[in-house]
Regions:
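Short, hydrophobic/aromatic-rich segments at coil-to-beta transitions
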Residues: 32-37, 60-65, 129-136, 157-160, ...
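Short, surface-exposed coil-to-beta transition loops
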Residues: 48-52, 142-147, 159, 171-173, ...
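Short, solvent-exposed coil/turn segments at beta-strand boundaries
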Residues: 30-33, 55-64, 76-82, 130, ...
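Short N-terminal edge-element motif at the start of the domain
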Residues: 89-144, 153
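Short, solvent-exposed recognition patches
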Residues: 194-277, 290
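An acidic-aromatic
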Residues: 43, 49-105, 160, 165-175, ...
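Gly/Pro-enriched, hydrophobic low-complexity segments
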Residues: 128-196
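N-terminal leader/targeting segments and the immediate start of mature chains
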Residues: 5-61, 69-72, 114, 124, ...
Length: 301
């Protein structure tokens, strides 16, 4: 009798999770082919910022153009997983850096693998005036961010994304405040093809021989995807970049300095510094601060 009850409960849980992932994949499909202009607010402990998001569908990929509405006309453009930063006021275009909204782009990209996450439909409510269903994506480990998504009951589009800490506190909330048709995207789309080709060549040259620094404690969900150096006032500082397909972080290894502020957080972005021997290590990226501490936990004192 007890075994029968256990198997029945397990079967029910698997069925409910399958329904949840089906609802989430429906949202991804709707978002992929949406051609919309949205006003989006991003709020966290540092305050709130407003953005304009232009989203179109091209070559079976989602193209997003995020523009800051606070001050300078700046932001980033993304096609699939290829993108770049821009600042129209300074006539600048350069490598893609971290942005709070990149988690939105990657999470709703149908190519992002969510193996290692469980899915639960937690109910219905209203968000930004819309009737929504709530989808909770929780990591099966204890160190990554979780996600609570509000899905529009009418058009299956995302209305809000809350990024959750490992203890379920809200780190950052991304909310769609208004939606309208796209007026037009003034962007040369060939730049994405050039970037994609360049990245493909670089990855073939680099990823075949990369090895994780042995002093780091990297969870199995994260892969080493890039290694390089940055110029810090004339000093070349080596780094390694890790990703689980949804979030990324870098580890820098520099000459030892006086660490004044060992840890900082800004929404989903954490920075942690730690000295070991003659070196100072810095973990920077879209991970909780406790996760960053774990990455450096094996360093000798």
């Amino acid at each position: 009798m007890l075994l029968t009850f256990f198997y029945a409960a397990n079967s029910f849980a698997q069925t409910e999770e399958a329904k949840c992932f089906s609802a989430f994949n429906e949202l991804r499909g709707s978002y992929l082919k949406a051609e919309k202009q949205m006003t989006v607010s991003v709020s966290n402990s540092s305050g709130m910022t407003l953005h304009r998001l232009l989203h179109i569908y091209k070559d079976n990929k989602s193209i997003s153009y995020w523009e800051n509405l606070n001050g300078e006309i700046r932001g980033y453009a993304l096609k699939g997983d290829v993108g770049f930063d821009f600042n129209q006021d300074k006539e600048y275009a350069g490598p893609l850096t971290w942005h709070q909204t990149l988690i939105w782009d990657r999470l709703f990209n149908s190519d992002t693998d969510l193996t290692g996450f469980s899915c639960v439909l937690t109910g219905r409510t209203r968000v930004a005036g819309q009737k929504v269903s709530l989808i909770r994506l929780a990591p099966k480990d204890s160190y990554r961010y979780g996600y609570l998504i509000a899905k529009d009951d009418v058009n299956a589009m995302p209305v809000e994304l809350a990024v959750l800490s490992p203890n379920s506190g809200i780190i950052t909330k991304i909310t769609v405040n208004s939606v309208s048709p796209v007026d037009g995207l003034n962007l040369d789309l060939s730049v994405f093809d050039n970037l994609s080709e360049q990245n493909s060549v670089n990855n073939k040259e680099e990823n075949s021989f990369l090895e994780i620094w042995p002093e780091l404690n990297i969870p199995k969900e994260y892969k080493l995807v890039e290694e390089g150096e940055i110029d810090d006032n004339g000093v070349l500082v080596p780094y390694q970049l890790f990703s689980d397909g949804l979030t990324t972080f870098r580890v820098y290894k520099n000459a030892k300095t006086s660490v004044v502020i060992p840890a900082l957080t800004n929404g989903t972005i954490s920075i942690l510094r730690k000295s070991s021997g003659d070196y100072e290590y810095a973990v920077v990226g879209e991970i909780p601060i406790l996760f960053a501490e774990s990455v450096l936990s094996d360093l000798p004192r």
